[in-house]
Amino acid sequence: MSKPGKPFILNSPFAPSGDQPSAIKKLTEGLQDGLAHQTLLGVTGSGKTFTIANVIAQLNRPAMLLAPNKTLAAQLYAEMKAFFPENAVEYFVSYYDYYQPEAYVPASDTFIEKDASINEQIEQMRLSATKSFLERRDTIVVASVSAIYGLGDVNAYMQMMLHLQVGAIINQRDILARLAELQYTRNDQAFQRSTFRVRGEVIDIFPAESDEIALRIELFDDEIDNLSLFDPLTGHSFGKIPRYTIYPKTHYVTPRERILTAIDQIKNELTGRQDYFIKEHKLLEEQRITQRTQFDIEMINELGYCSGIENYSRYLSGRQEGEPPPTLFDYMPADGLLIIDESHVTVPQIGGMYRGDRARKETLVQYGFRLPSALDNRPLKFEEFERLSPQTIYVSATPGNYELEKSNGDIIDQVVRPTGLLDPIIEVRPVASQVDDVLSEIQQRVALDERVLITTLTKKMAEDLTDYLDEHGVRVRYLHSDIDTVERVEIIHDLRIGMFDVLVGINLLREGLDMPEVALVAILDADKEGFLRSESSLIQTIGRAARNLNGKAILYADRITHSMQKAITETERRREKQQKYNQEHNIIPQALNKKVRELLDIGQTDKQKKGKQAVKIAEQSASYTPNAPKSRQALEKELKQLTQQMQKLAKDLEFEKAAAVRDKIGQLKMALLEV
């Protein structure tokens, strides 16, 4: 398949500065010299993403960015999208909103059926990501660790594509039959993703990987007379095109010949398994495996797929036992780049995925719920991941031993920030008075309209501290592990816009999310050596205050542990280097005024997005801005108007919009107190 050689066009009003130019130069030269592994030690707020964007643009090679979770992947995706608006920036994370894998608990003889809720928007983005890798050189895919999980075989996927060209001889029935093979469904009433409709000699197709473009095929007898793209909502035509390729609805489609071969192989394995269970006098297990597998075979034969078809992926992709599954890496061009963000977290995650998955499946196989071949439906083993990985850049403020070893200890330092901001000042204070001391510090910060993060060791302490601060009039929220990804981003968004001032957490305030408004990080019980108070954890947590001009970290401890000493020494090293650079170049540190980006519409339905847009319109109509000086009379008048607007929206059952107006009222009341 020919791929257009469109270059990456980096869109940024800023030129690289601070340590960025030397980091870009070293990384680019290293990749050109064929280095397989490089490590970028980039401190918080040093513009690591911008450095990577420059490297990609200079080398003009497709890239995959791996992030440790969906939240950071969404943030990276938003940033890369802004840097490369003219190129293909894609998003590839797990498409499950909810996922309960099938499992068997022998102790209670409980079988748990697979139960999942698939997010259609993210499924579309995943299909778009693989399409871009197959079609375009100017592609950046931002992925989570989902990238190491099994995906449909790339060769079978490409074999199933439907290529259409103006002037091609093909009759309507053949096109419809091919669409059915691609698992598209006919729906002449509701035109949505992965469906087609037929009107006379016109076929409209809504591609599975698209969210805003549909294809119209106009036939004349058995010849394609016209191909055109149009807006599926309005019907507005985007113009005629000479050719178009329809991609399958799912990555798991398989040609008919391969399906028939796979069915024979599944039957052979089933026979062997039946003999084994009968020989072992396990008649219940023999009955289970026979019943389940025969039902699946029937479904695959009739429809081309069945529930849990991924458990037969070894046969459907034509692999041998123990071979690595096809993954996103198989769709990636051979000269692609791999960038692992927050590598000190992401790399160990990749290593742990295979073992957890294997333990669950072995139980299913042992008790007759799955054939042994189901064990090959798995994520990549760590050594397979290493073997498949192209040239790799590890990015972290605290690289782990693995990254240092792979890079032969040669680290590219990006410590100096373009803004001239310094690493936070660190103070160590006694544990005995930590709660009262934190309260006093909070009051000082709130008076300056700054935010505070507090990290504790236990859930109980976090809850008690939150209650205590709340009783003392502090606007505080508690971020715990039960909060889902979307709500977590919303809480951090609310902290940034000033809906509350203090966020308390345990292990959720470390990597990644930009919060320039946070001026103080308080680490309680910093001298309790362990996972949450390790050197890298402390450096990452301290780094949350590094984007603020007045950044400060207070470590409450009665003794200086080995981890604390190393974290303090490293922070002081960075601070010294930053100060020296600022003096040499006459740089005055500047506050980082980073826009509060909306990450939350990734993976939301059109209906949810429209609701959010309507909320934004409601916000714009309220002329109140927190920093605009207004008289008390004007504020009271506006408060009255907004209250009426909120009541009307609530009466009309427009609760999302009403909640947005309610938040405005809260800000307005705070402004009134200050007048």
UniProtKB/Swiss-Prot annotation:
Source organism, top-level taxon: Bacteria
Chain positions recorded as ATP binding sites: 42-49
Disulfide bonds: none
Function: The UvrABC repair system catalyzes the recognition and processing of DNA lesions. A damage recognition complex composed of 2 UvrA and 2 UvrB subunits scans DNA for abnormalities. Upon binding of the UvrA(2)B(2) complex to a putative damaged site, the DNA wraps around one UvrB monomer. DNA wrap is dependent on ATP binding by UvrB and probably causes local melting of the DNA helix, facilitating insertion of UvrB beta-hairpin between the DNA strands. Then UvrB probes one DNA strand for the presence of a lesion.
Gene name tied to this protein: uvrB
Gene Ontology MF terms in the entry: ATP binding; ATP hydrolysis activity; DNA binding; excinuclease ABC activity
Annotated UVR domain residues: 636-671
Residue intervals of the Helicase C-terminal domain: 434-600
Family, similarity comment: Belongs to the UvrB family.
Record-annotated Helicase ATP-binding domain positions: 29-414
Cell membrane keyword on record: no
Coiled-coil regions listed: none
Protein's name in the database: UvrABC system protein B
Motif Beta-hairpin: chain residues: 95-118
GO biological process: one example: SOS response
Pfam families: Helicase_C (PF00271), ResIII (PF04851), UVR (PF02151), UvrB (PF12344), UvrB_inter (PF17757)
Keyword tags: ATP-binding, Cytoplasm, DNA damage, DNA excision, DNA repair, Excision nuclease, Nucleotide-binding, SOS response
GO cellular component: cytoplasm; excinuclease repair complex
